[in-house]
Regions:
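Short alpha-helical segments in extracytoplasmic peptidoglycan/chitin-binding modules
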Residues: 75, 107, 121
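Short, well-ordered secondary-structure "scaffold" segments embedded in the functional core
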Residues: 117-120, 124-393
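Charged, often Cys/His-bearing segments associated with DNA-binding zinc-finger transcription factors
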Residues: 1-93, 147-148, 153, 347, ...
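Generic hydrophobic, aliphatic-rich segments that mediate packing or membrane embedding
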Residues: 75-78, 82, 103, 117, ...
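Short, amphipathic alpha-helical "recognition" segments used to contact nucleic acids or chromatin
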Residues: 101-114
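An N-terminal domain-cap segment
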Residues: 89-99, 188, 192-193
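Short, flexible loop/turn motifs enriched in small residues
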Residues: 76, 101-102, 202-207
Protein backbone atom coordinates (compact mmCIF):
# COMPACT_ATOMS: atom_id res chain seq x y z
CA UNK A 1 0.00 0.00 0.00
CA UNK A 2 2.81 2.43 0.85
CA UNK A 3 4.54 1.79 -2.47
CA UNK A 4 1.31 2.46 -4.34
CA UNK A 5 0.73 5.70 -2.43
CA UNK A 6 4.24 6.98 -3.18
CA UNK A 7 4.02 6.22 -6.88
CA UNK A 8 0.60 7.82 -7.20
CA UNK A 9 1.93 11.10 -5.79
CA UNK A 10 5.15 10.95 -7.79
CA UNK A 11 3.40 10.39 -11.10
CA UNK A 12 0.57 12.82 -10.44
CA UNK A 13 1.97 15.32 -12.93
CA UNK A 14 1.96 12.63 -15.62
CA UNK A 15 -1.83 12.42 -15.57
CA UNK A 16 -4.72 14.79 -16.20
CA UNK A 17 -5.12 17.91 -14.10
CA UNK A 18 -8.35 16.54 -12.67
CA UNK A 19 -6.52 13.44 -11.45
CA UNK A 20 -3.85 15.57 -9.80
CA UNK A 21 -6.43 17.76 -8.05
CA UNK A 22 -8.21 14.65 -6.87
CA UNK A 23 -5.04 13.29 -5.27
CA UNK A 24 -4.17 16.68 -3.75
CA UNK A 25 -7.69 17.27 -2.46
CA UNK A 26 -7.80 13.89 -0.77
CA UNK A 27 -4.39 14.43 0.84
CA UNK A 28 -5.38 17.89 2.12
CA UNK A 29 -8.66 16.61 3.49
CA UNK A 30 -6.86 13.80 5.31
CA UNK A 31 -4.37 16.15 6.95
CA UNK A 32 -7.15 18.57 7.98
CA UNK A 33 -9.15 15.79 9.60
CA UNK A 34 -6.12 14.58 11.50
CA UNK A 35 -5.37 18.05 12.82
CA UNK A 36 -8.98 18.56 13.92
CA UNK A 37 -8.97 15.07 15.45
CA UNK A 38 -12.25 14.19 13.86
CA UNK A 39 -13.66 10.83 14.71
CA UNK A 40 -14.85 8.65 11.85
CA UNK A 41 -16.54 5.32 11.78
CA UNK A 42 -14.40 2.23 10.98
CA UNK A 43 -16.64 1.43 8.05
CA UNK A 44 -15.93 4.88 6.56
CA UNK A 45 -12.18 4.29 6.98
CA UNK A 46 -12.39 0.99 5.19
CA UNK A 47 -14.42 2.51 2.39
CA UNK A 48 -11.93 5.33 1.89
CA UNK A 49 -9.02 2.88 1.93
CA UNK A 50 -10.75 0.77 -0.70
CA UNK A 51 -11.31 3.85 -2.86
CA UNK A 52 -7.64 4.86 -2.53
CA UNK A 53 -6.50 1.33 -3.29
CA UNK A 54 -8.55 1.33 -6.50
CA UNK A 55 -7.00 4.64 -7.57
CA UNK A 56 -3.43 3.58 -6.74
CA UNK A 57 -3.87 0.22 -8.44
CA UNK A 58 -5.06 1.99 -11.57
CA UNK A 59 -1.90 4.11 -11.53
CA UNK A 60 0.33 1.10 -10.92
CA UNK A 61 -1.22 -0.81 -13.79
CA UNK A 62 -0.06 1.91 -16.16
CA UNK A 63 3.48 1.85 -14.72
CA UNK A 64 5.67 -0.70 -16.46
CA UNK A 65 8.76 -2.28 -14.96
CA UNK A 66 10.95 -0.17 -17.21
CA UNK A 67 9.08 3.00 -16.17
CA UNK A 68 9.65 2.23 -12.50
CA UNK A 69 13.33 1.52 -13.11
CA UNK A 70 13.78 4.69 -15.15
CA UNK A 71 12.52 6.77 -12.22
CA UNK A 72 14.22 4.95 -9.35
CA UNK A 73 17.10 3.02 -11.04
CA UNK A 74 16.03 -0.14 -9.20
CA UNK A 75 13.35 -2.69 -9.99
CA UNK A 76 10.38 -3.02 -7.66
CA UNK A 77 11.79 -6.19 -6.09
CA UNK A 78 15.18 -4.52 -5.55
CA UNK A 79 13.46 -1.54 -3.96
CA UNK A 80 11.50 -3.83 -1.66
CA UNK A 81 14.76 -5.49 -0.60
CA UNK A 82 16.35 -2.11 0.10
CA UNK A 83 13.35 -1.04 2.18
CA UNK A 84 13.54 -4.29 4.14
CA UNK A 85 17.23 -3.71 4.92
CA UNK A 86 16.72 -0.10 6.00
CA UNK A 87 13.41 -0.49 7.83
CA UNK A 88 15.06 -1.11 11.26
CA UNK A 89 16.92 2.23 11.06
CA UNK A 90 15.69 5.13 13.19
CA UNK A 91 14.37 7.49 10.54
CA UNK A 92 13.71 11.02 11.75
CA UNK A 93 11.49 12.14 8.89
CA UNK A 94 8.96 9.29 9.11
CA UNK A 95 7.59 10.88 12.26
CA UNK A 96 5.64 13.10 9.90
CA UNK A 97 2.05 11.94 9.49
CA UNK A 98 1.66 9.54 6.60
CA UNK A 99 5.43 9.25 5.95
CA UNK A 100 6.88 5.74 5.83
CA UNK A 101 10.19 4.04 5.09
CA UNK A 102 8.83 3.43 1.61
CA UNK A 103 8.42 7.18 1.16
CA UNK A 104 11.91 7.79 2.52
CA UNK A 105 13.59 5.28 0.21
CA UNK A 106 11.65 6.22 -2.91
CA UNK A 107 12.15 9.94 -2.32
CA UNK A 108 15.89 9.44 -1.85
CA UNK A 109 16.22 7.20 -4.91
CA UNK A 110 14.31 9.74 -6.98
CA UNK A 111 16.48 12.59 -5.72
CA UNK A 112 19.70 10.69 -6.50
CA UNK A 113 18.51 9.57 -9.94
CA UNK A 114 17.72 12.99 -11.36
CA UNK A 115 19.10 16.52 -11.59
CA UNK A 116 15.64 17.84 -10.83
CA UNK A 117 15.70 20.72 -8.32
CA UNK A 118 15.21 19.70 -4.71
CA UNK A 119 12.08 21.84 -4.37
CA UNK A 120 10.57 20.08 -7.38
CA UNK A 121 11.29 16.68 -5.84
CA UNK A 122 9.72 17.93 -2.60
CA UNK A 123 6.58 18.98 -4.47
CA UNK A 124 6.20 15.49 -5.88
CA UNK A 125 6.11 14.09 -2.36
CA UNK A 126 4.08 16.99 -0.93
CA UNK A 127 6.73 17.82 1.67
CA UNK A 128 9.17 20.67 2.19
CA UNK A 129 12.48 21.08 0.38
CA UNK A 130 14.35 21.06 3.68
CA UNK A 131 12.81 17.71 4.56
CA UNK A 132 13.90 16.23 1.24
CA UNK A 133 17.48 17.36 1.89
CA UNK A 134 17.45 16.02 5.44
CA UNK A 135 15.89 12.79 4.19
CA UNK A 136 18.59 12.33 1.55
CA UNK A 137 21.35 12.85 4.12
CA UNK A 138 19.68 10.31 6.41
CA UNK A 139 19.30 7.81 3.60
CA UNK A 140 22.99 8.10 2.66
CA UNK A 141 24.05 7.78 6.29
CA UNK A 142 21.99 4.62 6.80
CA UNK A 143 23.12 3.00 3.54
CA UNK A 144 26.82 3.66 4.16
CA UNK A 145 26.68 2.59 7.81
CA UNK A 146 24.54 -0.54 7.40
CA UNK A 147 25.52 -1.75 3.93
CA UNK A 148 29.18 -0.70 3.82
CA UNK A 149 30.35 -4.28 3.26
CA UNK A 150 28.85 -4.18 -0.24
CA UNK A 151 32.11 -2.44 -1.18
CA UNK A 152 35.01 -4.61 -0.07
CA UNK A 153 38.46 -5.58 -1.23
CA UNK A 154 38.59 -8.98 -2.97
CA UNK A 155 40.27 -11.82 -1.09
CA UNK A 156 40.44 -15.56 -1.52
CA UNK A 157 38.04 -16.93 -4.12
CA UNK A 158 36.82 -13.47 -5.10
CA UNK A 159 40.38 -12.38 -5.81
CA UNK A 160 41.07 -15.44 -7.93
CA UNK A 161 37.87 -14.89 -9.91
CA UNK A 162 38.90 -11.31 -10.63
CA UNK A 163 42.36 -12.42 -11.80
CA UNK A 164 40.85 -15.06 -14.07
CA UNK A 165 38.31 -12.54 -15.34
CA UNK A 166 40.91 -9.96 -16.35
CA UNK A 167 43.07 -12.63 -17.96
CA UNK A 168 40.21 -13.98 -20.06
CA UNK A 169 38.69 -10.65 -21.10
CA UNK A 170 41.75 -8.40 -21.34
CA UNK A 171 44.69 -10.77 -21.48
CA UNK A 172 46.76 -9.37 -18.60
CA UNK A 173 47.90 -11.91 -15.99
CA UNK A 174 47.70 -11.50 -12.19
CA UNK A 175 45.53 -8.36 -12.34
CA UNK A 176 43.39 -7.98 -9.23
CA UNK A 177 41.83 -4.52 -9.70
CA UNK A 178 41.89 -1.47 -11.93
CA UNK A 179 41.49 2.15 -10.86
CA UNK A 180 39.67 5.09 -12.42
CA UNK A 181 38.84 8.65 -11.41
CA UNK A 182 36.34 11.44 -11.99
CA UNK A 183 35.31 14.64 -10.23
CA UNK A 184 32.20 15.41 -8.17
CA UNK A 185 31.11 19.07 -7.91
CA UNK A 186 30.37 20.57 -4.48
CA UNK A 187 29.46 23.97 -3.11
CA UNK A 188 32.15 25.83 -1.16
CA UNK A 189 32.74 23.36 1.68
CA UNK A 190 32.30 24.52 5.26
CA UNK A 191 33.56 21.39 7.02
CA UNK A 192 37.23 21.57 5.97
CA UNK A 193 40.06 23.78 7.32
CA UNK A 194 40.84 25.37 3.94
CA UNK A 195 37.96 25.23 1.44
CA UNK A 196 40.00 27.00 -1.24
CA UNK A 197 42.08 23.89 -1.87
CA UNK A 198 38.89 22.40 -3.33
CA UNK A 199 38.58 25.20 -5.89
CA UNK A 200 39.60 23.96 -9.33
CA UNK A 201 41.11 25.85 -12.24
CA UNK A 202 37.63 26.74 -13.50
CA UNK A 203 36.73 28.48 -10.25
CA UNK A 204 34.33 25.78 -9.09
CA UNK A 205 34.64 23.50 -6.08
CA UNK A 206 34.91 19.76 -6.53
CA UNK A 207 36.30 16.56 -5.08
CA UNK A 208 37.91 13.59 -6.80
CA UNK A 209 36.31 10.17 -6.86
CA UNK A 210 38.94 7.44 -7.05
CA UNK A 211 37.39 4.03 -7.60
CA UNK A 212 38.95 0.56 -7.74
CA UNK A 213 37.02 -2.14 -9.62
CA UNK A 214 37.23 -5.88 -10.20
CA UNK A 215 36.88 -7.57 -13.60
CA UNK A 216 33.10 -7.08 -13.59
CA UNK A 217 33.30 -3.39 -12.82
CA UNK A 218 32.18 -3.91 -9.24
CA UNK A 219 33.58 -1.27 -6.89
CA UNK A 220 36.08 -2.77 -4.45
CA UNK A 221 37.22 0.49 -2.87
CA UNK A 222 36.16 4.12 -3.34
CA UNK A 223 37.53 7.40 -2.03
CA UNK A 224 35.65 10.68 -2.48
CA UNK A 225 37.05 13.30 -0.14
CA UNK A 226 40.20 14.82 -1.64
CA UNK A 227 40.43 17.92 -3.87
CA UNK A 228 40.10 17.47 -7.60
CA UNK A 229 43.26 19.53 -8.10
CA UNK A 230 45.36 16.93 -6.37
CA UNK A 231 47.38 14.73 -8.68
CA UNK A 232 46.17 11.14 -8.84
CA UNK A 233 49.41 9.92 -7.29
CA UNK A 234 48.82 12.16 -4.28
CA UNK A 235 45.21 11.03 -3.87
CA UNK A 236 46.28 7.38 -4.05
CA UNK A 237 48.92 7.97 -1.39
CA UNK A 238 46.27 9.43 0.94
CA UNK A 239 43.82 6.52 0.57
CA UNK A 240 43.73 3.32 2.61
CA UNK A 241 44.80 1.38 -0.48
CA UNK A 242 47.81 3.66 -0.91
CA UNK A 243 48.80 3.21 2.72
CA UNK A 244 48.46 -0.58 2.41
CA UNK A 245 50.66 -0.53 -0.71
CA UNK A 246 53.38 1.20 1.29
CA UNK A 247 53.09 -0.74 4.54
CA UNK A 248 52.04 -4.28 3.59
CA UNK A 249 51.41 -4.82 -0.13
CA UNK A 250 51.65 -8.62 0.18
CA UNK A 251 48.69 -8.75 2.56
CA UNK A 252 46.72 -6.52 0.20
CA UNK A 253 47.54 -8.18 -3.11
CA UNK A 254 49.04 -11.64 -2.37
CA UNK A 255 51.39 -11.40 -5.33
CA UNK A 256 48.85 -9.80 -7.68
CA UNK A 257 48.86 -6.20 -8.91
CA UNK A 258 46.66 -3.19 -9.64
CA UNK A 259 46.44 -1.52 -13.04
CA UNK A 260 46.35 2.27 -13.37
CA UNK A 261 47.16 4.92 -15.95
CA UNK A 262 50.42 6.82 -16.31
CA UNK A 263 49.53 9.32 -13.57
CA UNK A 264 50.33 6.69 -10.94
CA UNK A 265 53.80 5.54 -9.85
CA UNK A 266 54.97 2.26 -11.37
CA UNK A 267 55.85 -0.56 -8.98
CA UNK A 268 55.67 -4.34 -8.93
CA UNK A 269 52.32 -3.95 -7.12
CA UNK A 270 50.93 -1.18 -9.34
CA UNK A 271 51.48 -1.45 -13.09
CA UNK A 272 51.09 1.42 -15.55
CA UNK A 273 51.49 1.80 -19.36
CA UNK A 274 54.83 2.24 -21.06
CA UNK A 275 55.53 5.92 -21.77
CA UNK A 276 54.67 6.59 -25.39
CA UNK A 277 57.75 8.10 -26.98
CA UNK A 278 56.62 7.08 -30.48
CA UNK A 279 59.32 4.40 -30.46
CA UNK A 280 57.49 1.58 -28.71
CA UNK A 281 57.95 -1.89 -30.12
CA UNK A 282 55.10 -4.24 -30.94
CA UNK A 283 55.22 -5.98 -27.55
CA UNK A 284 54.98 -2.75 -25.60
CA UNK A 285 52.19 -1.45 -27.84
CA UNK A 286 50.28 -4.67 -27.26
CA UNK A 287 50.78 -4.33 -23.51
CA UNK A 288 49.57 -0.71 -23.53
CA UNK A 289 46.47 -1.66 -25.50
CA UNK A 290 45.59 -4.31 -22.95
CA UNK A 291 46.16 -1.84 -20.12
CA UNK A 292 43.76 0.60 -21.77
CA UNK A 293 41.18 -2.16 -22.17
CA UNK A 294 41.42 -2.99 -18.48
CA UNK A 295 41.15 0.67 -17.45
CA UNK A 296 37.98 0.95 -19.52
CA UNK A 297 36.31 -1.36 -16.99
CA UNK A 298 36.74 1.17 -14.18
CA UNK A 299 35.96 4.23 -16.27
CA UNK A 300 32.91 2.47 -17.69
CA UNK A 301 31.57 1.80 -14.20
CA UNK A 302 32.18 5.41 -13.16
CA UNK A 303 30.47 6.71 -16.29
CA UNK A 304 27.46 4.46 -15.73
CA UNK A 305 27.36 5.47 -12.06
CA UNK A 306 27.10 9.15 -12.94
CA UNK A 307 24.58 8.43 -15.70
CA UNK A 308 22.27 6.47 -13.39
CA UNK A 309 22.68 8.71 -10.34
CA UNK A 310 22.67 12.11 -12.01
CA UNK A 311 22.48 13.93 -8.68
CA UNK A 312 26.24 13.34 -8.43
CA UNK A 313 26.58 16.09 -11.03
CA UNK A 314 24.75 18.64 -8.86
CA UNK A 315 24.64 17.57 -5.21
CA UNK A 316 24.84 21.22 -4.12
CA UNK A 317 26.21 20.34 -0.70
CA UNK A 318 28.51 22.54 1.36
CA UNK A 319 30.01 19.51 3.09
CA UNK A 320 32.78 17.26 1.82
CA UNK A 321 31.64 14.62 4.32
CA UNK A 322 28.03 14.60 3.12
CA UNK A 323 29.15 14.60 -0.50
CA UNK A 324 31.41 11.64 0.17
CA UNK A 325 28.53 9.76 1.83
CA UNK A 326 26.29 10.40 -1.18
CA UNK A 327 28.95 9.14 -3.60
CA UNK A 328 29.58 6.01 -1.54
CA UNK A 329 25.83 5.41 -1.29
CA UNK A 330 25.52 5.40 -5.07
CA UNK A 331 28.50 3.05 -5.36
CA UNK A 332 26.94 0.68 -2.80
CA UNK A 333 23.64 0.65 -4.70
CA UNK A 334 25.57 0.04 -7.92
CA UNK A 335 27.27 -2.99 -6.37
CA UNK A 336 24.09 -4.37 -4.79
CA UNK A 337 22.17 -4.27 -8.04
CA UNK A 338 25.02 -4.55 -10.53
CA UNK A 339 22.92 -6.39 -13.13
CA UNK A 340 20.63 -3.35 -13.28
CA UNK A 341 23.43 -1.08 -14.48
CA UNK A 342 25.58 -3.55 -16.39
CA UNK A 343 25.29 -1.82 -19.75
CA UNK A 344 27.76 -0.76 -22.43
CA UNK A 345 28.82 2.88 -22.42
CA UNK A 346 30.27 5.05 -25.14
CA UNK A 347 32.12 7.65 -23.05
CA UNK A 348 34.87 6.31 -20.82
CA UNK A 349 37.22 9.27 -20.59
CA UNK A 350 38.88 10.54 -17.44
CA UNK A 351 37.79 13.81 -15.85
CA UNK A 352 40.91 15.89 -16.47
CA UNK A 353 44.30 15.54 -18.14
CA UNK A 354 47.20 15.22 -15.70
CA UNK A 355 50.92 14.88 -16.22
CA UNK A 356 52.33 11.35 -16.14
CA UNK A 357 53.89 10.58 -12.79
CA UNK A 358 57.40 10.25 -14.20
CA UNK A 359 57.22 13.84 -15.54
CA UNK A 360 56.44 15.36 -12.16
CA UNK A 361 59.15 17.21 -10.24
CA UNK A 362 59.09 14.53 -7.56
CA UNK A 363 58.29 11.69 -9.95
CA UNK A 364 60.37 8.79 -11.18
CA UNK A 365 60.26 6.14 -13.90
CA UNK A 366 59.25 3.39 -11.49
CA UNK A 367 60.75 0.93 -9.06
CA UNK A 368 63.15 -1.70 -10.39
CA UNK A 369 60.64 -4.41 -9.51
CA UNK A 370 57.89 -2.60 -11.39
CA UNK A 371 60.02 -1.97 -14.48
CA UNK A 372 61.11 -5.60 -14.57
CA UNK A 373 57.59 -6.97 -14.07
CA UNK A 374 56.14 -4.76 -16.79
CA UNK A 375 58.86 -5.82 -19.21
CA UNK A 376 58.28 -9.50 -18.42
CA UNK A 377 54.52 -9.25 -18.99
CA UNK A 378 55.01 -7.40 -22.28
CA UNK A 379 57.53 -10.01 -23.41
CA UNK A 380 55.14 -12.83 -22.57
CA UNK A 381 52.42 -11.15 -24.62
CA UNK A 382 54.81 -11.00 -27.55
CA UNK A 383 55.64 -14.70 -27.26
CA UNK A 384 51.96 -15.54 -27.15
CA UNK A 385 51.32 -13.49 -30.27
CA UNK A 386 54.13 -15.21 -32.18
CA UNK A 387 52.98 -18.63 -31.04
CA UNK A 388 49.47 -17.98 -32.29
CA UNK A 389 50.75 -16.76 -35.65
CA UNK A 390 52.83 -19.92 -35.98
CA UNK A 391 49.88 -22.13 -35.09
CA UNK A 392 47.60 -20.61 -37.71
CA UNK A 393 50.18 -20.14 -40.49
Amino acid sequence: MALQTCIAFLLADSYDVEDFLFFKKNATRKRRKVRMKLKTEPSDDLQREDEKRDIFNAVLQSLTISDFKSHFQLTTSQTEELVRLLAPCKWTAIRQEGWTVWHAVLASLWALSTQEAYHSVANRFHITESLICVQLDEFCTFVTSNLANEIHWPHGEEAEMSVVGFLSTVGLPDTLCVVGTCFIPVEKPTDVPDPEVYRDTEGSYSIKLMAFCNHKGRFTYVSAEHPRNWHNSRVLSATEVGKALRENPVALLHGKHIIGNSTFPLSEHFLTPFPDYATLGQKKVCYNQKVQSSLAVAQGSIHTLRSCFQRLRCLQKHSVCQTSLAVKTCCILYNMFLETYNVLVDCIGDDVTQKPFHELRYGHSGSLGGISKRQDIAASLGRTTKKRKYMYS
